C-alpha cells in the first residue's frame, strides 16, 4: 500500500525516507542482484599479411589520441614550488622587533635578514638579553621605529634554513634503556661552530650599540603593558 507522503513545505515532505521505509516495509523485499560479467581482455596477436611474394607482420595500431613521440608524455604530478614570502615594509635589516610569543616573548631583538623560507633571522644580541641567533615568523613580531645600522655586520652564508634544521633522533632503544626506570635528561651540547658564529655577529652589533647612549639598555628592557595601556593605541 502506497503511503501518502505529501509536501508540507517547499522541498519538505511529511515523512522522511526512513519513516516511509519503516511504514511500508520496503526493506523486506529482496532485490535480485545483477552481477555484471567480467570483461575478458583478448590478448593482442600480431597480424601477418601477405604482400606479393613475401609476408609481413603488421604492427599494433596505436590509439588515435596517443602522442607520436613518447617524450611528449608529461607527468601529471604537481610540482612543489616554494613561493617567496613578502616581508612587511616596516621590517628591514637592523629594525628592532618585539617578540610576541614563545620562549622569548616580550624581548627586543635585532632583525638581520630574511631567509629563503620567508622567516626572519634575528639576534638579541645574546650577550645583551640572552636571545641567540634564531628564526621567527613575521606574524609573531612587532616592528618598532628604532633601527640599528647593521651594514658592518657580516652574516655567514652558512647561516640559512638548513643551519637551524633539527637533528633526527634515533627511535631504537637498547634493552637496558627500555627496562630502566630512571630517565636521565641529557643536556644538549651546542656545537663550537654555532658559538663562534654567535660571537662574530654579536661583536659587530655590540660595536654599533656602543655608539648610541641608551640603545643597550633599551634592548635589555623587556616589553610589557602597564595598567591602562592598550597595544592598538601605542606607537612603537
From Swiss-Prot:
Cited SUPFAM superfamilies: Translation proteins SH3-like domain
Record-linked CDD domains: KOW_RPL6
PROSITE patterns: RIBOSOMAL_L6E
This protein's UniProt keywords: Ribonucleoprotein, Ribosomal protein
GO cellular component annotations of the record: cytosolic large ribosomal subunit; extracellular matrix
Superkingdom per UniProt: Eukaryota
Any single Pfam family the record assigns to this protein: Ribosomal_L6e
GO biological processes: cytoplasmic translation
One MF term in the entry's GO annotations: structural constituent of ribosome
Record flagged with keyword Calcium: no
Family: Belongs to the eukaryotic ribosomal protein eL6 family.
PANTHER family referenced in this protein's UniProt entry, alphabetically: 60S RIBOSOMAL PROTEIN L6, LARGE RIBOSOMAL SUBUNIT PROTEIN EL6
Protein name, as recorded: Large ribosomal subunit protein eL6
Amino acid at each position: 500500500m502506497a503511503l501518502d507522503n505529501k509536501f508540507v513545505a517547499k522541498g519538505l515532505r511529511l515523512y522522511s525516507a526512513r519513516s516511509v521505509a519503516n511504514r511500508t516495509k520496503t526493506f523486506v523485499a529482496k532485490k535480485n542482484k545483477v552481477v555484471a560479467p567480467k570483461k575478458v581482455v583478448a590478448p593482442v596477436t600480431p597480424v601477418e599479411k601477405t604482400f606479393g611474394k613475401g609476408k609481413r607482420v603488421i604492427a599494433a595500431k596505436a590509439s588515435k589520441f596517443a602522442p607520436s613521440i613518447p617524450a611528449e608524455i608529461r607527468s601529471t604530478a604537481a610540482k612543489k614550488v616554494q613561493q617567496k614570502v613578502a616581508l612587511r615594509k616596516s621590517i628591514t635589516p637592523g629594525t628592532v622587533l618585539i617578540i610576541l610569543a614563545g620562549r622569548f616573548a616580550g624581548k627586543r631583538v635585532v632583525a638581520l635578514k630574511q631567509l629563503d623560507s620567508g622567516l626572519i633571522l634575528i639576534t638579541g644580541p645574546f650577550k645583551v638579553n640572552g636571545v641567540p641567533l634564531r628564526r621567527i615568523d613575521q606574524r609573531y613580531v612587532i616592528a618598532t621605529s628604532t633601527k640599528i645600522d647593521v651594514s658592518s655586520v657580516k652574516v655567514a652564508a652558512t647561516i640559512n634554513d638548513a643551519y637551524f634544521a633539527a637533528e633526527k633522533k634515533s627511535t631504537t632503544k637498547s634493552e637496558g634503556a627500555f627496562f630502566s626506570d630512571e630517565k636521565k635528561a641529557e643536556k644538549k651540547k651546542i656545537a663550537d661552530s654555532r658559538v663562534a658564529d654567535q660571537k662574530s655577529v654579536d661583536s659587530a652589533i655590540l660595536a654599533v650599540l656602543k655608539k648610541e647612549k641608551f640603545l643597550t639598555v633599551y634592548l635589555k628592557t623587556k616589553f610589557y603593558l602597564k595598567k591602562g595601556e592598550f597595544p592598538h593605541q601605542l606607537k612603537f
